[in-house]
């Protein structure tokens, strides 16, 4: 059945849910995509991701074109104008089509009386486009990050903050992990090339391939059979550092959606793995991934701060703690993070990470390894967190594998490389 709803209206409503209501894009977008049908789902995704990526510039332009912002019940129209501006500024959609469809979105929003206003604002932009596009690259809005985060990055990484911000504003590459139980990386790459696609092997990570162009997983040879998993190369680095072995008791804590759980079992098929996450909905995806790769693990819902509740007095040979964090290293994949996070969240997240680390440490066997990981680039969650942990726990030793000036390894997001990530490998004496 043909869907009749205005796509620009749906994009505006989806963006409003993220920016005004604090919902995550990955939670609200799938339902929105179902309402427009397969053909338009990709365009809806492009508009939502694009507006959230470039929000400060769009806000700045609206501020130049309108004397006062739209508030209250008119707020959705504000986001509809943003959708219109994004199309005119950053896409190849013909201007006449972008304009007509966006103006018509006012009817779908039950604000037909504002069609003239929307049309006027977008046409005014067209008249001043060159001048506005030049001016919007002068102030802080050019960096496309909230002020608080920009200040934290400048303070933490005075030499690298621009590189981090630039990478955050790019479209992310699509990384794959080849399941070595089925194929070597080179053998699967041959299958991919036979299907007409290209990928590039990572020089350090033996299972990792970067697709030349992202595609739907259904187009990847053997995806449903578990030959391949979509996982960023930085996340793949966790299991290489954890170094699991057959026969070991291994805990994957904060395991959802299961990419690292399955990677552990690819590396050590005879390991006894327990995968734990606090979020029941996301935990279901761990089970789905295990099923797709025909692997076995004990999957449990549980809070990392109270391990005795879900593992009793069990001690593990290895623990992978992919801690809850600000996700500031994966902004390019989830641009809504910039608008969902607040400055005060960082201290709260650091406190939560500390509680989980301290709670789970007694469940590591003497001689065992705990790998602490985050997808953050903020020191409070990373080397500062681990520095404080080492001061509290005399029986913990950090295995130095990176820059010796600070504990652990900090990776920044890179255009053709991995996401921003942090790792610290701790051994119990």
From Swiss-Prot:
Task: Offer one Pfam family short name for this entry.
Answer: Methyltr_RsmB-F
Entry protein name: Ribosomal RNA small subunit methyltransferase B
Task: Cite the EC number.
Answer: 2.1.1.176
Task: Please name the gene that encodes this protein.
Answer: rsmB
> What family does the database annotate?
Belongs to the class I-like SAM-binding methyltransferase superfamily. RsmB/NOP family.
Native source species: Erwinia tasmaniensis (strain DSM 17950 / CFBP 7177 / CIP 109463 / NCPPB 4357 / Et1/99)
Please classify the protein's predominant subcellular localization into one broad category.
cytoplasm
Q: Where is the active site?
A: 375 (nucleophile)
> Per the UniProt entry, what is one GO biological process?
rRNA base methylation
